[in-house]
C-alpha cells in the first residue's frame, strides 16, 4: 500500500481504483493482512465483496466513524461510517475496545446499527458477560486494528487502547465459537517495526 499515492490515511478515487485492482482476484473470505492502521479503510473494499447480509465486528481503539473531511474521500477514520451508509448487506456493526471519549464523538443516528463495547466496559466482568452472551444471526466479518491493544502487546503508529493480547484472544475465541466467520482482516503494523 505504501508505494501508491492517494492511499495513506485517505483514499482518493485513483487510489481506490488501484487498491481494488490489487485485491480483485482475492475473495473476502479468508484472512487478510492490511499494513498500518492508515489503511484500515481496506476493510470496506473487502466487505464490499460480500454478496450476502453480514455483521461487522471491529476491534479498534478508534470507532472510525468520523464524517469525511474532504469531499467524501474515504479515510482510515471514516470507513465504518461509510460501510453503514453505503453497504446494504451490512446489517450491524459491533465495535470493541474503542475509547469512551471517541465513542461519544460518533455522529448521532447510528444507535440501532452499532453496538459498542468500550475499553472501559471491558474492564468490568459485566461487560465481558454481555459480550459473551451476545449472538449474531448470520455471517460475521472481523476486522482487527492492533491499536486496540495496549503498548505492551503491540507497537502501532496510532494511540493505543488497553486490551492485552490475551484479552483479545479470549474475545476472538468467543466469536469463533459462536459465529459463522466469513473473513478476517488485521491492520496496525508500525513503520518502525517494518524497518521503513
Identify the residue ranges that each predicted region occupies.
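Conserved alpha-helical scaffold segments that buttress catalytic/binding sites
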Residues: 3-196
Amino acid at each position: 500500500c505504501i508505494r501508491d499515492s492517494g492511499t495513506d490515511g485517505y483514499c482518493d478515487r485513483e487510489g481506490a481504483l488501484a487498491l481494488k485492482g490489487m485485491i480483485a482476484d482475492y475473495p473476502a473470505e479468508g484472512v487478510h493482512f492490511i499494513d498500518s492502521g492508515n489503511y484500515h479503510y481496506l476493510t470496506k473494499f473487502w466487505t464490499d465483496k460480500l454478496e450476502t447480509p453480514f455483521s461487522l465486528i471491529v476491534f479498534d481503539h478508534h470507532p472510525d466513524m468520523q464524517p469525511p473531511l474532504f469531499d467524501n474521500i474515504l479515510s482510515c477514520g471514516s470507513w465504518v461510517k461509510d460501510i453503514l451508509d453505503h453497504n446494504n448487506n451490512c446489517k450491524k456493526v459491533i465495535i470493541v475496545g474503542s475509547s469512551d471519549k471517541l465513542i461519544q464523538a460518533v455522529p448521532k443516528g447510528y444507535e440501532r446499527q452499532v453496538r459498542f463495547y468500550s475499553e472501559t466496559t471491558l474492564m468490568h466482568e459485566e461487560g465481558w458477560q454481555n459480550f459473551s452472551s451476545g449472538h449474531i444471526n448470520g455471517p460475521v466479518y472481523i476486522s482487527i486494528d492492533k491499536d486496540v491493544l495496549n503498548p505492551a502487546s503491540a507497537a502501532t503508529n496510532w494511540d493505543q487502547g488497553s486490551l492485552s493480547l490475551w484479552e483479545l484472544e479470549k474475545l476472538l475465541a468467543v466469536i469463533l465459537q459462536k459465529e459463522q466467520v466469513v473473513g478476517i482482516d488485521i491492520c496496525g503494523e508500525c513503520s518502525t517495526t517494518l524497518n521503513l
